[in-house]
Curated annotation (Swiss-Prot):
A cellular-component GO term for this protein: nucleoid
GO biological process, one term: DNA repair
Superkingdom: Bacteria
UniProt protein name: Single-stranded DNA-binding protein
Coiled-coil region(s): none
Length: 152
């Protein structure tokens, strides 16, 4: 198998209102925290257990930034597809720090609003990246193009 794949798919809830910042060039970037919760039944005690994992999400895609600005708030349920990236920086004391983030920045990125409160306010595709390949869009099929006669 040639090449490699870096793809993250998450379904979870936004932990706090998304934070928007603007670069020096005027490009908008959104940061948000997404919680995913795993539940299971303990084999010994039969208790229901759960563990929540928090994910840092950074959105560079203009189309997705626009959707998040308008519709996403604390508690919103999202489906996201992006890639995993680790960033390095130096803190105020010069110490190297690292953070790993789910990044949505290219045509392979997706964000879908799963809340019923949000889905009534816009059409289903408004949450998808505008950078998707045209062949991945939904196309309706017109049955009138088919011949009525069976060829055998």
């Amino acid at each position: 198998m040639a090449g490699s794949l870096n793809k993250v798919i998450l379904i979870g809830n936004v932990g706090r209102d998304p934070e928007m910042r603007t670069t020096g060039e005027g490009k908008k970037i959104i940061n948000l925290s997404l919680a995913t919760t795993e539940t299971w039944k303990d084999r010994i005690t039969s208790e229901r257990k759960e563990r929540t994992e928090w994910h840092r999400v950074v959105i560079f895609s203009e189309g997705l930034v626009s959707v998040v600005e308008r519709y996403v708030t604390k508690g919103s349920k999202l489906y996201i597809e992006g890639s995993l990236q680790t960033r390095k920086w130096n803190d105020n004391s010069g110490q190297e720090k690292y953070t790993t983030e789910v990044v949505l920045q290219n045509f392979n990125s997706q964000l879908i609003l799963l809340d019923s409160k949000n889905s009534n306010n816009h059409n289903q595709d408004s949450g998808h990246s505008e950078y998707k390949h045209p062949e991945t869009k939904n196309h309706s099929f017109d049955h009138s193009d088919l011949d009525d006669e069976i060829p055998f």
